[in-house]
Amino acid sequence: MTADTQTPVTKVDQAPPLLIKKLSDKARLPTRGSAFAAGYDIYASKETTIPARGKGLVETDISMAVPAGTYGRIAPRSGLAAKNFIDVGAGVIDADYRGQVKVLLFNHSDVDFVVNEGDRVAQLVLERIYTPEVVEVEQLEESVRGAGGFGSTGVGSGVGEQMKN
């Protein structure tokens, strides 16, 4: 390959593009709220009501191809969670998935929540993924934590506990 046929890199940290296909005229491309935003806002393509204490799938009318070596994580938008008790569930977009992206919303409030066409309902965060070979072993190397599970490391800073001793 000669220098004439190489694709120019305009930035040192230039990443491969996120490819989006609109499935209808109501679809909107994901957008970032600021230059340093980690996620891309995902938009509803039609009105959907999420029942009180219930769940619902919100259509986006987009499909995508995430860059090689990444997956897409559908994450909550902080404003929806803080103001309306709306959370996002089950949101992994694998590199080989090409179907419509839908957003599973949980309504933890006592009133129905209406998602309007064009509302930002979640954010898409692209994360690098490492998929090593699975190897079964007879024993694992010991660690300081050991098998301690939920709550085993405590909730405080540990400073008070150290001062008591």
From Swiss-Prot:
Its cofactor is Mg(2+). InterPro entries: dUTPase, dUTPase-like, dUTPase-like_sf, dUTPase_trimeric. It comes from the Eukaryota. Keywords: Hydrolase, Magnesium, Metal-binding, Nucleotide metabolism. One of its GO terms (biological process) is dUTP catabolic process. Pathway: Pyrimidine metabolism; dUMP biosynthesis; dUMP from dCTP (dUTP route): step 2/2. Gene3D superfamilies: 2.70.40.10. SUPFAM superfamilies: dUTPase-like (SSF51283). GO terms for molecular function: dUTP diphosphatase activity; magnesium ion binding. It is an enzyme of class 3 (hydrolase). Its EC number is 3.6.1.23. Substrate binds at R77, S78, G79, G91, V92, I93, D94, K102, R145, F150, G151. This enzyme is involved in nucleotide metabolism: it produces dUMP, the immediate precursor of thymidine nucleotides and it decreases the intracellular concentration of dUTP so that uracil cannot be incorporated into DNA. PANTHER family: DEOXYURIDINE 5'-TRIPHOSPHATE NUCLEOTIDOHYDROLASE. NCBIfam families: dut, PRK00601.1. Homotrimer. Belongs to the dUTPase family. This is Deoxyuridine 5'-triphosphate nucleotidohydrolase. The lineage of its organism: Eukaryota, Fungi, Dikarya, Ascomycota, Pezizomycotina.
